[in-house]
Amino acid sequence: MFQIAVLCVVFGLWLGVFDLALLAFSAPALRSLAGFPAKARATGIFVVRFLPLTLAAAITLGIFVPAWWVHEPENAEEALTLAQAAAAFVAFAPLGEGLRRAMRMASRTHTRLVDWRRRGQKSGLAASCPFDVVEVYGEGVALCVGGYFKPTIFASIAAMKVLTMRERRAALAHESSHASSLDPLRLLGMEACPDFLRLLSVDAEWRSAFARAVEFAADARASAGDRGTALDLAQALVKVARLGLAAPLKGLSVAPAMSNSVDLKARVDALANGPMDEDRRLPLSSGWALVLVCAAVCVLGTQESETAQRLTEAIVALLR
């Protein structure tokens, strides 16, 4: 128990350091990411937002845990002090709060999806779409994607009726992009990110930037560089918005076709008048970036294990 508590404190300290760094550089980081094409912007925001958690976990597991295992005597038994227990609790608080937020949002989302399925029927539109499409009777939904690992497109019957075939195809392509990118799951992750920034609710600009970015990214993928398809999607968005069918989706991890009127105007303008999004990706995929970070941490851990152990012992002494 003592060893676990101390390593939790180490993790919490690193998480706090990286969270402070991200908080300090949030504005320039978001400005820099805004310069990326729409298709890469959302992924960039997501990766940077989770960077403090990733680095803190990698350093703790890749450096401090092995150092403790190698250098701590097997017969070393120390009692857990009140200060150490309190510090471990504070360090673990972001993880606990993140889990609580995720479970609450997932529960609310599940309840809403069950209601939509109860009021809906599987659509014949699914034949031209790689994902299941459920057409829903009544209000409360216009066009959105729900589900984490097996996403489903939910569409209002009234919304589908007002769209032409080309507009319907473009709208479903937009939602299919959300589904293929697992945007509901990523939105859940952004809402429940287990770090101090989310615990203290000082990450609102990152969450709003990501929510906007996934919509622009889905627009860009749906239009696929074709101006005609982009115009069809713009017309579909305007028509569906005018119906006013969608209920507020705040607190739900679903990817709607439109979130608010301001973003809708900007998206329609980008689709109708903006340049087609160039096919430029991030310099490095998130997967390879994670591999490189872990490799660098492992190399550093073999070289600085004694330093890491001294830091751990200093933390233990400070909290006695």
Each model region followed by its residue ranges:
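Catalytic zinc-binding patch centered on the HExxH motif and its immediate surroundings
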Residues: 125-151
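Membrane-interface amphipathic/juxtamembrane segments adjacent to transmembrane helices
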Residues: 29-53, 108-130
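Transmembrane alpha-helices and immediately adjacent membrane-cytoplasm interface residues
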Residues: 49-118
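Short helix/loop segments within enzyme catalytic domains
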Residues: 21-22, 26-27, 32, 107-120, ...
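Cytosolic-facing loops and C-terminal tails of multi-pass membrane proteins
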Residues: 1-3, 16, 88-108, 121-124, ...
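Membrane-anchoring/interfacial helices and their immediately flanking loops
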Residues: 1-34, 220
